[in-house]
UniProtKB/Swiss-Prot annotation:
Catalytic machinery residues: H257 (proton acceptor)
Organism: Rhodopseudomonas palustris (strain BisB18)
Claim: Ubl conjugation is one of the keywords in the record: no
GO molecular function, one term: N-acyltransferase activity
Name listed for the protein in its UniProt record: UDP-3-O-acylglucosamine N-acyltransferase 2
Biological or metabolic pathway of the protein: Bacterial outer membrane biogenesis; LPS lipid A biosynthesis
Gene Ontology terms: cellular component: membrane
Pfam families to which the protein is assigned, alphabetical: Hexapep, LpxD
Positions of region (Disordered): 346-373
Length: 373
């Protein structure tokens, strides 16, 4: 449910529009002309709201909802009140997201403070910089010599784009970001306060102290990457730091120099990758994952929250713990330790220790929550 004023470009849809957009099947007698202007959870929805149900635990809430329309599987369709336009579909949450994207396009990326195209008063653009058609530069932003900004991109307030940086089309660089020594593809989103292209953490240590190693690589970010607020991506030492197409990096993450992250990876908040780490395609790193230098995380591997990785992770593996290891072995060790800790002075073991083992889904990746939709 949106608070009024934050998303001024919100558009309305009819139930019929939602059917056409999602391919859902309406219940007999559903009013396809009913106007839907907002989204809301089942227990807060009104006649102009769309909601959804995907889990059994919300069946009772569905039976009492006042929503104008509900996306649901066939399993729950009969529970909705007669006043609700029931839209049956195999994957209701995915359909709900499709509608949300249509209703609230400005919620998909950072937007201009003033919502106007062009260079705002107070922004500084070097005469040699190249700005394509439809670029927006908000107040306080600075764009350096020979930088190139692609068609339709946004440079937020107080962002700094360094010399020779290339940013593709339809990108959004949020307020307060710094981008240097980088080449960025199309449709890349960088949320406020992130820093990209600063020098990597490279030193030679001796008895006399620490001598800085010049970092002469770049950061290369491919199309459709999203980087959360307050994250940092260091440029490479003698090769590039690379973020592959479609990868999503959460808030407050650190990507060290020379890292190569593949396509469509997920890196959840507060994770840190040391230098020269390779993360292969479709890998998932749960919140607060830490990885030491020169490690490879295989294609499709998953790391539970707070994993600390000291060795290569095989493709498709599910690991967790400190040090990270296979989920099966990690859980056995946790159970064994808890059994030992629970023994009383007579040596008895608490039978419930195994029930306290970690959840099998401990990545920290958000899952759809009916009550918070």
């Amino acid at each position: 449910m949106s608070e009024s004023g934050f998303f001024l470009d919100a558009v309305g849809l009819s139930v019929g529009d939602i059917v056409a957009l999602t391919g859902a099947t309406p219940r007999d007698g559903a009013d396809l002309s009913r106007a839907i202007s907002d989204l809301a959870p089942l227990d807060r929805a009104g006649i102009a709201d769309l909601s959804f149900i995907a889990e059994t635990k919300y069946a009772g809430v569905l039976a009492a909802t006042q929503a104008g329309a509900v996306l649901t599987t066939e399993r729950f369709a009969h529970l909705a009140p007669e006043s609700v336009a029931v839209l049956r579909i195999a994957k209701p949450y995915e359909a709900f997201v499709a509608v949300a994207r249509r209703l609230y396009p400005s919620a998909l990326r950072p937007t201009s403070l003033f919502g106007t195209l062009g260079v705002a008063p107070g922004a500084v653009v070097h005469p040699s910089a190249k700005l394509a058609a439809g670029v927006t530069v908000d107040p306080g932003a600075v764009i350096g010599p020979r930088a190139e900004i692609g068609k339709g991109s946004l440079i937020g307030a107080n962002a700094v784009i360094g010399p020779h940086v290339k940013i593709g089309a339809d990108c959004a660089i949020g307020a307060g970001c710094t981008v240097t020594h980088s080449e960025i593809g199309d449709r890349v989103i960088v949320h406020p306060g992130s820093q990209i292209g600063q020098d990597g953490f490279g030193y030679i240590s001796s008895a006399n102290g620490h001598t800085k190693v010049p970092q002469i690589g770049r950061v290369v970010i491919h199309d459709d990457v999203e980087i959360g607020a307050g994250s940092n991506i260091d440029r490479g030492g003698m090769r590039d730091t690379v973020i592959g197409q479609g990868t999503k990096i959460d808030n407050l993450c650190q990507i060290g120099h020379n890292c190569v992250i593949g396509r469509h990876c997920i890196i959840v908040a507060q994770s840190g990758l040391s230098g020269s780490v390779t993360v292969e395609d479709f890998a998932v790193l749960g919140a607060r994952t830490g990885v030491i230098p020169h490690i490879t995380i295989g294609k499709g591997a998953m790391l539970a929250s707070r994993s600390t990785v000291y060795s290569n992770v095989p493709a498709g593996a599910v690991w967790g713990g400190f040090p990270a290891q296979s989920k099966r072995q990690w859980m056995r060790e946790v159970v064994a330790l808890r059994q030992l800790a629970a023994r009383d002075h007579d040596g008895r073991t608490a039978a419930s220790a195994e029930a306290a083992a970690p959840s099998s889904d401990a990545t920290g990746v958000d899952q759809p929550d009916q009550a918070a939709s």
